[in-house]
Structures are given as structure tokens and as C-alpha cells.
Design a protein with these regions (language model features):
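Secondary-structure boundary motif
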Residues: 53-56, 74, 103
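Acidic-basic catalytic patches of nuclease active cores, encompassing PD-(D/E)XK
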Residues: 18-63
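Non-catalytic C-terminal interaction segments of nucleic acid-processing enzymes
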Residues: 1-31, 35, 98-99, 116-126
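Catalytic cores of nucleic-acid endonucleases
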Residues: 79-126
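Active-site beta-strand-loop-beta-strand hairpin of nuclease catalytic cores
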Residues: 66-82
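Amphipathic coiled-coil/heptad-repeat helices and related helical stalk/stem segments
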Residues: 43, 66-68, 93-97
């Protein structure tokens, strides 16, 4: 996908500052993790398809310098991180995982938490 110069700069700056490029896993693939619920895996695919259809750049399987791998990274247009919650609640996410992101300067507004068990409405992503 061709990005506008300002969006490309945003992406480049984000990757330079926050992404661990030494970790050699293929980005932009969706790993079928046995530890995730079926609903979680399906919801990730649905969101990725929606982002593709909307021409919004995103990445998956991106290892951050803080060691986290968010479900979906979308540093332009919408929340930077999209996390699909399968068995955990928003409270669980913020109490167990958020501190790693917060230590890198991210805030709660940088996250969109999507419940894997609730039907996704496209407008929820904007």
C-alpha cells in the first residue's frame, strides 16, 4: 500500500522508536496461536480484512522494544494498537500488560480493545 509522505513519516518514526528490528519474525502474517480462542483468531482476521478494505496501513506480529507483540499495530489513522480480548477483560489487560506500554510513553488512548465474543461493528475501529 502506498502511503502519503506524512503517513510514511509517521510509520518510519514509530518503527524507529518502538519496534525491535532485531527480532526476526515475519511481520504481516497472522500466527494461529493454540493458546488463543477460536473467536480471538477469527476476530483478528475480521479486523485485518476491514483495515485492508479501508486502505488503512497496519502490521501484525510486530515485536516492540518493550517485548510485547500487539495483535495489530496501526500507527496512522486510528488507535496505534488494536488488542483482541478473548478470555481477558479490559481490566485484565490494563492491570497485567499495559504497564509495559506505559513505560514506553503510551497511554490508554493508544489502545483499542475489541471483545472477541461480541460482534464487531466497523465504526468501532474509527
Amino acid at each position: 500500500m502506498k502511503l502519503s509522505p506524512s503517513d510514511q513519516k509517521t510509520v518510519n518514526d514509530f518503527f524507529r522508536e518502538h519496534v525491535d528490528r532485531s527480532y526476526k519474525t515475519p511481520m504481516n502474517c497472522i500466527r494461529m496461536n493454540v493458546d488463543h480462542t477460536s473467536a480471538h483468531r477469527v476476530r483478528i482476521f475480521e479486523i485485518c480484512n476491514l483495515l485492508i478494505d479501508s486502505k488503512i496501513p497496519f502490521w501484525t506480529e510486530v515485536r516492540m522494544k518493550n517485548g510485547c507483540i500487539p495483535d495489530i499495530l496501526a500507527p496512522t489513522h486510528i488507535s496505534r494498537f488494536i488488542e483482541v480480548l478473548g478470555t481477558e477483560t479490559p481490566g485484565d489487560f490494563f492491570s497485567k500488560k499495559f504497564h509495559k506500554y506505559e513505560s514506553c510513553g503510551f497511554s490508554e488512548k493508544d489502545f483499542l480493545l475489541v471483545d472477541a465474543k461480541v460482534e464487531l461493528q466497523a465504526q468501532e475501529l474509527w
